[in-house]
Amino acid sequence: MSQAHDKTHLTGQDLVAMCVNDMVTCGAEPLFFLDYFAASKLEPKSTAKIVKGIANACKKSNCALLGGETAEMPGHYAKNNFDLAGFSVGVVEKENVIDGKKIKPGHILLGVESSGPHSNGYSLIRSILKKHKAPKAIMQVLLKPTHLYPAPVLELIKKTNVKGMAHITGGGLTENIPRILKKGLVANVDLSAWKFPKAFLWLQEKGNISTSDMLRIFNCGIGMVCILDKKEISKAQKILSAHKLRSFEIGTITKGRLQEQIQYN
């Protein structure tokens, strides 16, 4: 999709975001990033755009781009195809690791808005786009790079007592939130607490996707979930708002023995 719309330079931010957004959920600060770029033929202009996107995303995440590897592999990749990968290293004091062990019944789930589907669900998105032409406004959202959450989340951790966090990636809300919950806890999510963005509603309609499948495939407008005490929600929302991020009180933690540790209301 990015190639078809001349947006390959945005994939660099997607790459960095997938690493550093995962990292900050445990309270770690990103230190450095390394990338790998390979293609059948390296085109200097397009390669430079992608690397620039990576560098800019690292800068926004206060993460040094130490270096990386580029490889030209004729015959290994189809024409105009490329492979982009990377990894990041961060640091957090052992006693400050956020692992969800402090999550208790009564704690609140604060959902932080996403910029779009981020980097997940695109196999399904592409199949839908083969059958239906998306309006310009919808396509713009589908092509938006993944939000970089380190700056707002690390400030949130510094100024509030975050109990747990989930980066909503593959598996959507349904699979990512339960990963941080102890046995005996259930996340009760109120679907009326926020509205699915128009791009997700368009995908749901054109793809004939059930709401339960939407919640298991896409982030549905929520890119990060932070779990806090009720008394800290207002402060947390002000911090996120200062970073131009909307947030929603999307549910509560309760006791329960459900097979799935998430329930939608």
Model-derived segments and their meaning:
Residues F37, G100, N120, Q237-L240:
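Short amphipathic alpha-helical leader/targeting segments
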Residues S46-S61, Y77-F82, K131-L143, H147-N265:
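Glycine-/charge-enriched secondary-structure boundary and capping motifs
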Residues D14, E29, E69-T70, V92, ...:
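Gly/Ser/Thr-rich beta-alpha loop segments that engage phosphate groups in nucleotides
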Residues M1-H5, Y122, F200:
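Short, glycine/acidic-enriched capping/hinge loops at junctions between secondary-structure elements
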Residues M1-S115:
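Glycine-rich phosphate/pyrophosphate-binding loop regions near the starts of catalytic domains
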Residues P105-K136, Q140:
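Acidic, glycine-rich loop-and-beta core segments that form the ion-binding/anion-interacting portion
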Residues G27-E29, L124, N161, R246:
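Short loop/turn motifs at secondary-structure junctions
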